[in-house]
Amino acid sequence: MWYPPAAVVPFFESHSVTYEDRSAIAKWHFLPFDQRAVNEMTVLLNFLHISQGFHNETLYTDVRRRCMLMRSLFELVFANNYLELTNPKLLGWFLYLTAEDRTLIQNEGGLLSFLKKHPELGVTRQYVYVKAKPKGNYVPPPTTMASNDSRYPTFYGSSGCQNCGTSCPFGTKKCTRCGVHIVISQDKISVSENEKQLQLLPNSLKEELNVFQTSQSNVEMQNIHLGCTQSTLNTRSKQRSPEAHPHFYSKGMCSHAQCLSQLWQEVESREDAKHFKDTSAQASFCLDMELDVQSQVQRNDNTQNNQNQSYNPTEENDHNVDQETMPEYYSFSSISLDHTAWSNGSQSAETGFNDSITATKGSTELSDELSEAANSTAANSTDCFSCVSNSFELAEESGDCLDSRYEQQINKSNVGSSPKSKSSASVYVDQMIDACGDFRAFFTSTCATKTDQTFQVKNVATDTDLPAVSHEKDTQTMRMTTSDKNTITEVYMSDLDVLTEEFIKLKETEKGLKQMKSMNARRLCGCDCAQRVRKAELNLLALQFVMCQQHCWRRYFTSPLGESAYQGTEALPDSIAETLKTLQKDYHEMRQQILAGTPLDDLAPLSVNSEKISTGTNYSPSSVLAAHLDCAGSTIASDHKVDEEHTAMKVPPSEVCQDIETAPDEAKNECSKRDKALFILPKQTRISTEPKTVGANKDLNGSEAWFDAEEELGFPNQDGNMEKPNKMRETMRHKMETKGTDEDVSKQSSLLCITCLPGNITEHEVLLWFEKYNPTNVCISAFSNNTRAAIVYLKSYIDAKAAVEDLNGRSLQGHAVQVVHLSGTVSADLKPSDLSHSASESHKEDTAGDELRTKNLTYGSSHGGPRCSLERLTNVCNSPTASGTCVPQHYATMGSFDTIMARLSERHPNVARQRIVDALLELRAKHQGFLSGLPLRSIVDMTSELLTQTSSSARV
């Protein structure tokens, strides 16, 4: 039996190869496909040949395909030692199969079942690997088989017809079934990288090595010399994409280039090839190794000749298929090579010489057309020597009888040829033998340009070039791109530290995830409703706390104790301090209970007891809100009720001026309750409160750029809607006036409160100013902010009302004086001290109102929650906010504007205030936006002219 030559595959020794040079270090062992499986398949095919009557039936085709698939799969796994079942190479191999091949595998039970049924592959978990094989060459016992069944060889060394797909021996010109000529396109013959390396040789050396082809007939020999590596995959070459085939299945080249290319690839991947520093030394080593291999092959052939002298079958060229005898059948799937099995082939091929690798040594398996083609090209192929170097069995033996062996081979191959051909062949062999020294010299001088140890590594499965391997072994952290999972890395301490750190981070992350899951499990639902409800309850509790604080401050500053404390700088009394501390303590306790999970509805409402501050009961914001929601139209007093003024204005208590103390409803309150006076101060104009005395401080800004500030017509305690406070003020004033007309005039108060007085005015001057209204007494009081107010007592209520209508808003020594009628009954024996007290109380309502509201709102404007400090704070800002007193930007320069407005109001009492402001803006536009350089009298005169012109034009 003859076995086809073995494919040279690198065998890696994992116990002695490190990560860096694992893909570079290779020991070239001949690992044959298991011969027992080969023999079994041979017997099976012989039986099929006999039973099917030499025809290419479906069963025979399926078995052939199955064997071919097993062969291809074995080569893929063998090139990588082992593969994962999900490896892209294995999956790509399956996807590139034809539909018939995939159907065949699916009929076997799928790819996994097909792998398990493979005789040379094993499947463990998620990996497929090559089973252990004995190292070295396996020499099977010689077997003799004779049969008259089939003239077909096996799949290797055969090709398929392009018309009918019938398998024909490789090199056959005409199909034996349909008679169509088999054409092998020369354009598809690819040029390998090794041939490119051969092109670098000098022309003289190429001629000596006889690399060039001299005739067209050599193209046919190239197809014959493809050998077992071509195999039956050529029958599928036109059905698959080029990426599906390894490159070495489609290489076509001359026998010399094929031998040298394979030698080059073998030595380049060999273990000791790493020690060469340039390609010239590698080329020399290739030539030496080729000569050694040829020497060893010759010795093996001589040994086999002595043992098997009786085994010398001759080739018969019988064109009759029925009378053809079955030759020595050879294996169709073996990759091993036994040189003794066909040692007599070269001697017995005298009648039909064929030096192809796939030629059957000592058999007649080739067809007649193949024999004719070989005979026709024998004369032109005398320069070709036998390519037995495909075995590439590396040995350290020296070639002793190279000359005699080569001459003997040439003499055998040139039987029947002319003497001229013999002489040329002899010269060629001599040149091949003597070219060793010249080869080194030429190649060293032309190609020895690299000094680094860098060379290409071939992938056996796909015959593609892998990235250049660097053999430096400095550190393990060098990044090397690998697509296979067949490497074992050595672990160093630095890598262990990194892995430990990553493991700790992973554990911490898992711990955090577990905590988050436990927190989510505690929630009532999957959303954040519970957190939102808790946040809303905390905000509501904080609002109630602020309302209680405001209530305490309002009670305190409207009491006599708060009035005296406001005029001085003394500390807060113990009553208000203790009340606020108790409120603060209750607030924090309720907040902690809410955070612990107790709903706000289950807790007692937050309240404050203001009995220590002034007369009153317990105040609870929640009860006030509940009463307001239950009975929106009812009037509720300060003890948890809303007064009738609040109900009439339809605004909550927080929007009402906080310095107004409502009077109890007569229908709801008992007669024992104390009546309280309701002080209503109209909107005060923002004027300078500094006294105009000699040596007094002037305005901070002398430019009098009052025109840059717009007039603020809104309520001083609000920053939004300005119409609502005006309506509220008018409604309350109308009620007081109506109430005054219904009661007895004699019982009404005749007290007037005059504010915004100049700093140098005296009581006598005030009496003279109210002379026509019958004043009886005047009391002037000065406050800590240099503000002065006077209380004027008139004889009758009618005089007081007339004085308010005539003198309110008039200018007194350059100041716009505000005159307010104090409501309520006044006893006849009113003393000056009482008048002073009333004046202080009335002026306190106006001047200290802003500061009181500032204190109250300061506690509610803290970003971190309600302010717990009990000190008197003042929050002054440049822009209006809901939590602070708004100080206009040009507050210190508004004195001149107030003076101009007062004088224009005196000259034009029937003109509205907004019309005067429009006239001033028009005057400023005429002077290009600057009025600061003009005296105030000139500005008043020019504005008055504009108002007069506008009035006259409106009348016309």
From Swiss-Prot:
Keyword Transit peptide annotated: no
A GO CC annotation given for this chain: intercellular bridge
Membrane-spanning parts: none
Subcellular location: Cytoplasm
Region of interest (Disordered), ranges: 301-321, 831-855
Keywords, alphabetical: Cytoplasm, RNA-binding
Any one GO MF annotation of this record: RNA binding
Top-level taxon in the UniProt lineage: Eukaryota
Residue span, RRM domain: 750-824
Annotated InterPro entries: Nucleotide-bd_a/b_plait_sf, RBD_domain_sf, RRM_dom
Pfam family, one: RRM_1
Ranges of Basic and acidic residues composition bias in the record: 840-854
RNA-binding listed as a keyword: yes
Residue pairs linked by disulfide bridges in the UniProt entry: none
Function: Component of intercellular bridges during meiosis. Intercellular bridges are evolutionarily conserved structures that connect differentiating germ cells. Not required for fertility.
Protein name: RNA-binding protein 44
Native species: Danio rerio
